[in-house]
Amino acid sequence: MNSDIISGKWTQLKGKAQAKWGDLTDDDFKVAEGNAEYLQGKLQERYGWDRDRAQTEVRAFEKSLRDDT
């Protein structure tokens, strides 16, 4: 997975991610620091999603960020 967008601009994007996934805590986002795999794991944990669903959600989020630029 190409997570350059997430890791490269994490500070700016964290607010959008928090708005999208409100069940994740500020600490979750601090630890994630743009790491897409960690973020996927937290989505699985908090939302009860399987790995594929969490990966799909993160990829869709990345795509929405690319489309915004």
UniProtKB/Swiss-Prot annotation:
SUPFAM superfamilies on file: Hypothetical protein YjbJ (SSF69047)
Gene3D superfamilies assigned: YjbJ
Pfam family, one: CsbD
Domain of life of the native organism: Bacteria
UniProt cross-references to InterPro entries, sorted A to Z: CsbD, UPF0337_stress_rsp, YjbJ, YjbJ_sf
Family statement: Belongs to the UPF0337 (CsbD) family.
Designated name of the protein: UPF0337 protein XAC4007
Organism lineage string: Bacteria, Pseudomonadati, Pseudomonadota, Gammaproteobacteria, Lysobacterales
